[in-house]
A protein has these predicted regions:
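Small-aliphatic-rich amphipathic alpha-helix that forms the alpha element of a beta-alpha
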Residues: 29, 33, 85, 91-118
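N-terminal amphipathic, basic helical "cap/leader" segment at the start of enzyme domains
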Residues: 1-84
Length: 118
């Protein structure tokens, strides 16, 4: 079953912007990620869910898209994400926790795939 979820996880560059993801589903994805392993069990990562059209529009200019496609500014209006989960490291709790963000991001992606997103 886990293998099937991993197979579902892909990099997406276009989304269904008009399909809202309920806040409670996003919060459940974050809660799942919160249970993932972290260096020294420090749990230094913090999360912010953005899921209103205004919040998504505000953050969009700051998102880097597709590192290999240098001339692409990201998805067009109508193809942008309808929600974001921002992950930040609380440096007061722990430094050099950069590997935790990858574990956490994949856990969120797996939780999203399990819910049928992606």
């Amino acid at each position: 079953m886990l293998k099937d979820l991993v197979k579902q996880c892909r990099s997406y560059r276009r989304f269904y912007q008009d399909t809202a993801i309920p806040y409670n589903e996003l919060a459940d994805m974050v809660d799942t990620a919160r249970l993932a392993a972290s260096a020294s069990n420090a749990q230094a990562l913090k999360f912010k869910i953005l899921c209103t059209p205004e919040e998504c529009a505000d953050i969009f200019p700051y998102i880097a898209w597709a590192g290999a496609l240098k001339d692409w500014d990201g998805p067009e209006e109508g193809e942008r994400p309808s929600a974001y989960i921002v992950i930040a490291c609380d440096l007061a709790i722990g430094k050099n926790k950069q590997w935790d963000d990858g574990i956490t991001a994949q856990t969120i992606m797996l939780a999203a795939a399990e819910k049928g997103y992606g």
